[in-house]
Amino acid sequence: MKYLIIQLLAVAFCWFAARSMRKHAIAYYVGAFALEALFLYGKFFSLPGFLWTPIFFAVDQCMLGTALFVVVMFVGVFPKNSPIAQRLRPSRGELSIFAWILCLGHLFYLTVIPRMADIAIRLGFAMPMTVVGLIVALILLVLLIVLGVTSFKFVKRAMNAATWKAVQRWSYLFYACTYIHVMLMVVPSAVYGSGQAVFTAFVYTAIFGSYAVLRVKRALAEKAEATPVAKPEVAGA
């Protein structure tokens, strides 16, 4: 239920803040970095409860960043002339960078090598799926850094257009790894009877499964549009 609430809040945030973010992107990025810095500080040290509770709710388990990426994902499969695409597509780059920043802290915390080694030793035999999930998190961190850095406009302008497009296609691998990571982290709890874990697995599967279907459908439609229609020959011409 927690993720579903954050997802609905993320959709509302993107709808109302998209135009503002496009105009004042730096301010949003600074705010996201500040939130991540507070999250990491709270994880390694401590924060007052009135600060830690909302930050933990939003940032822990990367739920807010993932929810924003879900919006970015779906904007790409809606028809360009749809109301949703017309409102959000112009700000898609800024939204993706904002989501990217909000994911960095969580993945960094998970993939600090001493921490990963400690978890692997403690859970390696009892919960191997969780250990694999941490390894996938490391892959996600690498993909996130590459995709995030190349999303900045000044980096995009400095790159060859074909190379930039090829790099951005890695986003599909990032989305797939995100789903795999979540499943590896929640399925063990679901197997042991956690209703919350079962619900989370169901919601993520529904969202990412729907995206996969819509993405394939759009790709087929784009391919059909790009294929020239042969004109019938006129008899006697």
Outline where the language-model segments fall.
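Membrane-embedded alpha-helical bundles that constitute the cytochrome b-like, heme-associated redox core
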Residues: M1-A237
